[in-house]
Swiss-Prot record:
It comes from Streptococcus pneumoniae serotype 4 (strain ATCC BAA-334 / TIGR4). NCBIfam families: L17. GO terms for biological process: translation. This is Large ribosomal subunit protein bL17. The gene is rplQ. The keyword DNA damage does not apply. Belongs to the bacterial ribosomal protein bL17 family.
Length: 128
């Protein structure tokens, strides 16, 4: 089996994977179900590999998948302006250089206790 269906149609599944991948790149750690964590591991690894390549084509490929969300906002008192960093900028400027010497294995999945409502196996996925 090449992928998990996760009980959704293909468009819903792709949207969910894009959202979770973007959230992981922004927050660097999220809590989700084990099945979802194992699926987004694949996409996050691909995005970080694209970030390490760093050329224009890699940036465009990553931009086609990662949502255009603000990762952080800073206020500069000298210029009296706010500067914001998107998830894509964070991927290429902060996350990718951190793994320059590492060949794969950028994420870690830690199993936690089951969810209370439906006993779904939960996991924390984080960037190493």
């Amino acid at each position: 089996m090449a992928y998990r269906k996760l009980g959704r149609t293909s468009s819903q599944r792709k949207a969910m994977l894009r959202d979770l991948t973007t959230d992981l790149l922004i927050n660097e750690s999220i809590v989700t179900t084990e099945a979802r964590a194992k699926e987004i591991r694949k996409t996050v690894e691909k995005m970080i590999t694209l970030g390490k390549r760093g050329d224009l084509h890699a940036r465009r490929q990553a931009a086609a998948f990662v949502r255009n969300e603000i990762a952080s906002e800073n206020y500069d008192e000298a210029t009296d302006k706010y500067t914001s960093t998107t998830a894509l900028q964070k991927l290429f400027s902060e996350i990718a250089p951190r793994y320059a010497e590492r060949n794969g294995g950028y994420t870690r999945i830690l199993k936690t206790e089951s969810r209370r409502g439906d006993a779904a196996p939960m996991a924390i996925i984080e960037l190493v």
